[in-house]
Curated annotation (Swiss-Prot):
Enzyme Commission (EC) number: 4.2.1.10
Name of protein: 3-dehydroquinate dehydratase
Positions annotated as active site in the UniProt record: 24 (proton acceptor), 102 (proton donor)
NCBIfam families named among the record's database cross-references: aroQ, PRK05395.1-2, PRK05395.1-3, PRK05395.1-4
UniProt-listed Gene3D superfamilies: Dehydroquinase, class II
Keyword terms, alphabetized: Amino-acid biosynthesis, Aromatic amino acid biosynthesis, Lyase
Signal peptide: none
UniProt similarity note: Belongs to the type-II 3-dehydroquinase family.
One GO BP: chorismate biosynthetic process
Enzyme type, top EC level: lyase
Quaternary structure, from the entry: Homododecamer.
Length: 151
């Protein structure tokens, strides 16, 4: 039976493709979700992609991941990255291998974006690769889970 991973996207990521395309590019959230599904399938994994503008909903999905025995998480917490101790605590609490991803290079932007509460709860962080960061995140997560590329 294929292992499931969750790909969680936080606030404003529903606006990908139209919000500040000079920073985030023109790819849409639908493009991200398609890329994630295809990449995961290449490792025999199932990617369940979700997006919410609400912190509590993201936390509920993280908790649900534990109860459903989800193998791993990829999370782009958007602006909550820099503010949410609650998301950090949820990730630490469920003890599921997690990769943090950001479309833009947060370290080349405003100072307030340079701190991540998510990073300390993740085994890896990626930023600045555009939506390809999701492919890289799933590839790294698959390696962590011992999943091999399928033919």
């Amino acid at each position: 039976m294929a292992q499931t991973i969750y790909v969680l996207n936080g606030p404003n990521l529903n606006l990908l493709g139209t919000r500040e395309p000079e920073i985030y590019g023109r790819a849409t959230l639908a493009d991200v979700e398609k890329l994630c599904a295809e990449t995961a399938a290449g490792f025999g994994l199932i990617a369940v992609c979700r997006q919410s503008n609400h912190e509590g909903q993201l936390i509920d999905w993280i908790h649900q991941a534990r109860s459903e025995k989800v193998a791993g998480l990829v999370i782009n917490a958007g602006g909550y990255t820099h503010t949410s101790i609650a998301l950090h605590d949820a990730l630490v609490g469920v003890q599921i291998p997690t990769v943090e991803v950001h479309v833009s290079n947060v370290f080349a932007r405003e100072d307030f974006r340079h701190h991540s509460f998510i990073a300390k709860a993740a085994f890896a962080s990626l930023c600045g690769f555009g939506i390809d960061g999701y492919r890289l995140a799933i590839t790294g997560l698959a390696a962590k889970l011992g999943a091999s590329a399928t033919a």
